Structures are given as C-alpha cells and as structure tokens.
C-alpha cells in the first residue's frame, strides 16, 4: 500500500541513506507510483514515500513558508469546506486544491492532527523544536509499522520495507501467527513478524535523536462513547444531516471517481444523496462466470435510475489462468495480511483502475451504522496443527473475548477496522484510492449517540435512501430489502433471496462434509451451476477441486510445505487429497495452508522478492 517509510537516527548519512533507498524500493510496486526521499541530517530524519501519481498525496514533501516545518503525508484528508481559503486569508501560501494546507494547519492548530478527517499517516519534521512527529488517523486504518533498534527507529507503510534493511526480523511471531490462524488477522497491534509492531490508532509520537521521546495519543474512544444518546427521530435527523452535508467532500480532487456499486444499501444511499449529473459518474460491479449475480442485476437498475453508465468486471477464466501470480502477489503486497482467497480482489481492482483511479465504496456501512461484528475466532480442523502451536491458536480466542469488553461501536471502528479490514483495504489501495463516507469523523461520532433500536435492522438506511431519492427507494436490494410496500410480497422476496444466499454458502466453502461426499458422486452433472454465482463472484471450493487442483497439489504436497514445524504432515496430505479427489470440503483449510506457505516463501525463506519496478529513487530535497 502506498505510504511513507523511513528511519530516525543519529548514525551517519552514509549509513542511513542507503537503507532509506532500499526501503523505498521495497514498496514501489507499480509503474504508476511516484517515489521520493527527504533528508535532514541535523534532525536525523530520513523519510521516503510512494504515492499513486496524481493522487491526493502526490508531490511530497510539503513545507511552510519558512521551511522549518516539513510534512510527508500519505492517504487522504476530507476537510471542512473553505479550510484552505481560511488559511490563505491568514497569510499562508495554501493552494486551493490538494494537500498543501496540511502543513499550515499544523502551524495554526496546537492539537494537530486531531482535527484531521480521513485515513492517513504522516511524518512532520519541526526544525525549530528539533523533533519529528509520526502520526496516523484515529482509526489506525492507514497502517504504519515500526521497529526500534539501538541505532535507529524504523517506520514503514509495509513491513517488508523494514525487513529489507533488518533481515534479522524475518522470523515469525508465534502469537501473531496463532491469531492469524484463528481470527484471520493479528490482534492488538502485533504483526506476523517478531519485533515489528503496528502504530496504534490516533498516535502522535514525538521522536528525537533517533528514539521515541513520547508516545502521545490525540484521541480516545471514550470521548465519543460518553456522549448522551439521542431519541430515535432526533438521531435520524442528525445522521441524515451529517451524511448529506459531508458526502460531497468524498467526490473532490483531480482524479476521476467511479462508484463500486453493489445491490446493497450502503452504495445506494451514496447515489441517493450525491445526485450526480447524468453520465458523470461511471459505475461498475464485480461479477463472476456462472450467471449475473444479484449485485450486478440490482446495481444496473440503480445506475440506470441515476442516469449513469454501468459495466461488469468479471473474475473468470483470465483470473484463474493467472491464479498463482495473483495469489502470491496478494500475500506479498499485504505482508500476508490477506489470505489467497482475496486474490480475485486484486484482479478486479486492477480492472477498476482502468475505469477511474478513485473507487467510491459503501465499505464499513454495516459495521458502523449497525455495529456488526465481522470476524470471530475459528477452530482449525482437528490434527492439522501440532499441539505446541495449537496453544497459540487457542490463546487467540481468549484475547479476542477480552477485546469485546468495550463499546460495540468502538470495537467495530477502532479494533475490527484496523485489524480485520486492513488486509483487503491495503490490497485494493495498491491499485487505486478507496473512499467511503461511512468512516467520516462526524458520522462515526454521531453514531455513538444512536439508540440501540436503530442498530437492530436496516430501517434507518432504507429511510435515508427514500429521503434522498424515492426512485431508488423503490428498487429492492440484493437480499430483498426496500422496494414495493406490502408485508407478504416483501417478506417472500426476502426469504427467497436469503435462501439462495445461504444455499450458495452451503454449496461453496460452507458445504458440510456429508454433502460434499454426495456432491462428489454427482460431480458429472455439475450441480454447482444451480447454486453458485447468485450472490458471490468467486467460488474456491470448486476452483480448488478443478481448475486450481494442480497448483494446490504442487504447493501443499511439496516437501517444504510438509516440513513446516507447526503442521502435521499426514493431516495436511489428507486434507489436500480429500478435497481434490475424495469428495470432501477443506476450502477454508486450503486458503490458510496456501497463505502460510506463501508467507514462508515470500518473507521468511531466502531473499525477499526483487521489486520489478525497482529504479533509483531521487532525493527531492535534502538539508545538511
């Protein structure tokens, strides 16, 4: 994921600058990335960056008029309208568009970066104070890793940048690995790599002379948790006002915006209130090969009702033919924070970038407005892992249960967001800029005042859509919400699509073993065609069994895989052969095993892969 990297050190420049160069090279993954470095030897600051060309944070670093405040910023910030103008009226050289206002905001706002709104991280060097401040957004969504040695403090948007210069860290952390196996992500700001941590949300750490001076935090969730709750009608009016007034901020900037339109409520609400002029906002939906899924069918209706173009981006034969590439790339780009089943997302986002470099989504709408919990610990198939490692897997459940002892919205926004959702966000942002109005500061703060009754169903969003566009209110969602009035027709419609949704899950990776054996007997009839593709666009149970069987066999029955110390060799062989030829369903286990093996091959065994975009990174500015 594009971002900043670097080190703070008192070591000589001849020691530090080559490391910075290697760190920048490690995260330049695409030809459309812009990279650079800035160095101040007197402060011991060595900072670099990678940014998508023409994006909000292209053109770093930022400087004030005197040149004593320098900012390297990554991500996006959605300020109050008129912020740059007001700073210019106070004598600052802030441009009307772009991020230049940020460094001037630091000069005016003693609480900086508390007023910022978005997903971001940055390093601000203050030559007057002789310090550097490393900061991130209040949700911790724009991740930054760090590592401290006696020589330097390292920080990076991707762990691989630190691994590139500190090879002794290329060893797995057993606790983090156990959490990843159990929960699908690492908890409590740990990582898969021993000695590398994640900067906590809302950090504003002060660094001096190559070390951490203070670990400040500019925000605590209790500031929002302790607000007085609102009555249902007052809450709805407040949410409606915040959503409608702040939404236009997310459509600003130089780059073209496309909407990743689904059949659900969250993108529908965006379309209902943004009201784009006809033909100005390209829309697209991700689809599969069996049939047009409900997302495609409904999204097409929504786009047509709004006067916008719509296209389907398919993940099918081309993707499957290059699955090894996309699987390995997905794991590598995210520092193994996603499993290989997210590789289709890399493929479709490459295609989405051709439509528009900014992708508007409804991400996090359910999690914020309804406080939904999207992940929980799982139990591995018996015997797959050796008992010594299984203890770490079981410990993850205890850790997770402890983390639930907080406000449910705080869990969703400040824990689930930066841990569970980070991997997919990081993967997608390697290709384009993702935006969502559902983690807007004002909206999340207001949602902490929601009465519990409004979080129990979809009524609030259906009403919000209707107030913005009665036409869009009349189109049923992919699962049958909204649309025509009348209990029986609506209830029957919802029951039918709820059944097809669950049936697709049961026929894909959720298929019970006894059903898998029956399905195996009838495999010549391809019964999957009856169920798959109605709601999802990827189908790994069948793919692993058929199109990807050779890759699965070569990877997981390889002697290197079978020799991993935490795996039971015989059980791994039984899982692979059972899924490929024995009429059993081990889709989730194969996801995990492939991901763990790629973790070893890409990060732990031998040298890190060479970046195909490797070029000499220029130092755009340097201070003696």
Residue ranges: model-predicted function:
Residues 1-318, 325-326, 594, 600-602:
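Cysteine-centered catalytic environments shared across enzyme families
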Residues 1-7, 40-41, 164, 194-196, ...:
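Adenosyl-5′-phosphate
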Residues 98-102, 117-119, 174, 296, ...:
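Conserved glycosyltransferase catalytic-site signature
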Residues 224-233, 257, 283-287, 329-334, ...:
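Glycine- and acidic
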Residues 233, 237, 241, 268, ...:
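Conserved structured core elements
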Residues 252-254, 352-356:
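Glycine-rich phosphate-binding loop signature in dinucleotide/nucleotide-binding domains
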Residues 266, 364-365:
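Catalytic metal-binding/acid-base residues of hydrolase active sites
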Residues 288-348, 366-384, 400-402, 431-432, ...:
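ATP-dependent adenylate-handling ligase core
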